[in-house]
Amino acid sequence: MKLRPAVVELVVRDMAATLAFYRQLGLDIPADADNEPHVDVELGGMRLAFDTEDTIRSFDTKSSPPTGGHRVALAFDCVTPEQVDAAWVELTGAGYEGHLAPWDTFWGMRYAVVHDPDGTPVDLFALLSA
């Protein structure tokens, strides 16, 4: 069996706060989606889905938020090292939690990590040679 990945899904506490964060990263999410229990965003061949905790519990009564660390991270290509720094400043300046300030990695990238409103790590990166 060979399956094709199609959707990455995030379970969120506060849909409006989460969507505001991902809009700040440049995702095209309609403003009227803030009160929806489920939102899909096209990512050029894949989709990013957001479901509220209540939506998941409506069909999986045993569902509970993860504890003790994250189970998924998203990574955004910022194209240039300067854009990594600019994205970090913009997001942390907007009040989002900065987890790891921008640094140059040993694998040749400029890298930073911020948390979305649910604590999901969002990596910001660019090749140093860009």
Ranges and model annotations:
Residues 1-6, 28-115, 126-130:
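Vicinal oxygen chelate
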Residues 5, 12-15:
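Onset of an N-terminal alpha helix
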Residues 10-13, 80:
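Short, surface-exposed ligand-recognition loops at beta-strand->loop->(often short) alpha-helix junctions
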Residues 16-17, 86:
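Alpha-helical macromolecular-interaction surfaces
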Residues 18-23, 91, 119:
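Conserved active-site tyrosine of GNAT-family acetyltransferases
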Residues 121-124:
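Short glycine-/small-residue motifs
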